[in-house]
């Protein structure tokens, strides 16, 4: 039988982890090192993630410091951050870029909550797809005579309970992120 509760849980956890990383990339008006995770810097004859050419730290709630290790890459890192679409304007200070995080206006907050909602819905869909795969495995196992009808029903309920628990966790994560975004 190809059904595995551990596999289903692992895949559902993966959907939640993916949601968490998506949420980390949303600018909430508060400084976070994860805010710059998606930035790619043209360096060394290719495109390199910012985290591989610099260290990012939070100076205070509204300031990030990016310490670029190679001074020849500072300008490229500055341009990459400005062109990222995050609305950030770094200030060069030697090999360090200081990035003030501007407060969000109401319109942008509403827009970010909608984006967060889309990310959460994608996570719910991923969880439901894992449920569907698990249910299909159970149906096949019952059809092939590997499990009884009663065992099939019990395992189906188990998969549904897991799904409900993970969807609830997605909803809780969304509620927390929306509260963080709307906080002035």
UniProtKB/Swiss-Prot annotation:
Q: Which BP terms from GO are recorded?
A: cytoplasmic translational termination
What is a single cellular component term in the Gene Ontology annotation?
A: cytosol
Which InterPro entries does the record associate with it?
Ribosome_recyc_fac, Ribosome_recyc_fac_dom, RRF_sf
Q: Which domain of life is it from?
A: Bacteria
The answer on whether this UniProt entry bears the keyword Membrane reads no
A Pfam short name: RRF
Q: Which Gene3D superfamilies match?
A: 3.30.1360.40, Ribosome-recycling factor
**Keyword flag Manganese:** no
Protein localization = Cytoplasm
- Its chief place of residence is cytoplasm
**Keyword set for this entry?**
Cytoplasm, Protein biosynthesis
A Gene Ontology molecular function term for this protein is: ribosomal large subunit binding
Matches recorded under CDD domains: RRF
Q: Which family does it belong to?
A: Belongs to the RRF family.
Q: What does this protein do?
A: Responsible for the release of ribosomes from messenger RNA at the termination of protein biosynthesis. May increase the efficiency of translation by recycling ribosomes from one round of translation to another.
**HAMAP family assigned to the protein according to its UniProt record, in alphabetical order:** RRF (MF_00040)
Q: Can you name this protein?
A: Ribosome-recycling factor
**Which classification does the entry list for the species?**
Bacteria, Pseudomonadati, Pseudomonadota, Alphaproteobacteria, Hyphomonadales
């Amino acid at each position: 039988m190809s059904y595995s509760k551990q596999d289903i849980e692992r895949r559902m956890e993966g959907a939640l982890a993916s949601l968490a990383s998506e949420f980390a990339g949303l600018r909430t008006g508060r400084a976070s090192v994860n805010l710059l995770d998606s930035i790619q810097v043209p360096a060394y004859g290719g495109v390199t993630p910012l985290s591989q050419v610099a260290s990012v730290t939070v100076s205070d709630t509204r300031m990030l410091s990016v310490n670029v290790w190679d001074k020849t890459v500072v300008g490229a890192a500055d341009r990459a951050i400005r062109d990222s679409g995050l609305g950030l304007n770094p200030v060069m200070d030697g090999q360090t870029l200081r990035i003030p995080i501007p407060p969000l206006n109401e319109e942008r907050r509403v827009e970010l909550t909608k984006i967060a909602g889309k990310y959460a819905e994608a996570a719910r869909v991923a969880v439901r797809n894992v449920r569907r795969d698990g249910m299909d495995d159970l149906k096949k196992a019952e059809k092939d005579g590997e499990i009884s009808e009663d065992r099939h029903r019990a395992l189906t309920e188990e998969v549904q309970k897991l799904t409900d628990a993970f969807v609830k966790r997605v909803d809780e994560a969304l509620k927390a992120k929306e509260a963080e975004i709307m906080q002035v």
